[in-house]
Amino acid sequence: MQQAALVGHSMGSLIALEAAARSPQRATRLVMVGTAYPMKVSDALLNTARDSPLKAIDMVNAFSISSLACKPSYPGPGIWLHGANRALMRRMQAGQTGLNLFLHDFQVCDRYANGLQAAASVSCPTHLILGSLDQMTAPKSAAPLAAALQAQVHMIDSGHCLMQEQPDAMLASLKASLA
């Protein structure tokens, strides 16, 4: 593949940013979802992730979803977004032997210090899709990055889990970003 549109959510948005900066000739679009820069993680969450990853999963789950009752019956009757997210995070954590995946990923986000320098190297059209109710990556924390990238910002009435909370609005914003 010679060229691609790069899309990432949260930590993945920083990865997409870095990839677009390192190979600007290959990035046709950059879409950063649920992003912030710097993407600092609180000491309380870092310490909890280190000492009690399952408790940190519960904390993140509470901070990432803005409603107890998201889109009716997402993705179908009987599904509970909070429970599904918790189960997925626990499964990912348990699948790593010898590595505290939750702590590792938070440390990567917390320590990433190349955002504005990377933004200066990005030459493709860039869009930020943000959740207006996001407590993990607050929209105001994305403002310096949006300015540096001259990005178009799409705001969705959602928390950090935009894809699950507002799938239709997220898809519409993504389609507009890639058009």
Located regions from the model:
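Flexible "cap/lid" loop of the alpha/beta hydrolase fold
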Residues: 14-63
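Hydrophobic "lid"/C-terminal helical patch
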Residues: 106, 170, 174, 178
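Conserved loop-alpha-helix segment in the C-terminal half of the alpha/beta-hydrolase fold
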Residues: 121-158, 164, 169
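Glycine-rich phosphate-binding loop signature in dinucleotide/nucleotide-binding domains
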Residues: 1-2, 122, 177
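Short alpha-helical segment within the catalytic ATP-binding CA
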Residues: 10, 14-15, 136, 161
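Alpha/beta-hydrolase fold nucleophile elbow
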Residues: 1-9
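Conserved alpha/beta-hydrolase catalytic His-Asp/Glu region
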Residues: 47-121
